[in-house]
Amino acid sequence: GARVISVARQGYGNALTGGINAARGRYIIMGDCDYSYDFSGLQPFVDALREGYDFVVGNRFSGTMEKHAMPFLHRYLGIPVLSYLGRKRFHTFIYDFHCGLRGFTATSIRSLNLQCTGMEFATEMIAGFANGNHKIKELPINFRCDKRKGASHLRTFSDGVRHLYFIVCKKTLN
């Protein structure tokens, strides 16, 4: 079952770090709870972790994507460009740097000592795994429209700039 925890400081990175630190299992799988990810399809993630992968990340572009599940500029400009730059900078094959459906071993994620508190945490995580000689796998996933009521917390321009700054300027922690 799920356990709800409270995190004192706001921010995507802070929330995920709080969840990672509170997790009790050998494997941790994270995903946005906006109905855009199909959590009934997690078996390939679990299988990959059991096969010895340290980090498993979804690829929304290689699975089925519902119409309007992702804004046009994110789908055709922002995510592809930032992912391309991230692949070159961190020498990894991951094509969807910003997919929120991810799995990892508790030991490996905690060894990365991730520091980012905002959305750029997603890029920092990939950089940490890529630069730390970890075994990585990317899996196609299905991506659906956000079914929540209310506004998204994503701030396209400022979040994109922070991801870009991390890719270009930050030294990796490993």
Regions found by a protein language model. Give the residues of each.
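Acidic donor-binding segment of Leloir-type glycosyltransferases
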Residues: 1-5
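C-terminal, non-catalytic tails of nucleotide-sugar-dependent glycosyltransferases
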Residues: 163-174
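Catalytic donor-sugar/metal-binding loop of nucleotide-sugar-dependent glycosyltransferases
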Residues: 92-93, 114-117, 126-144
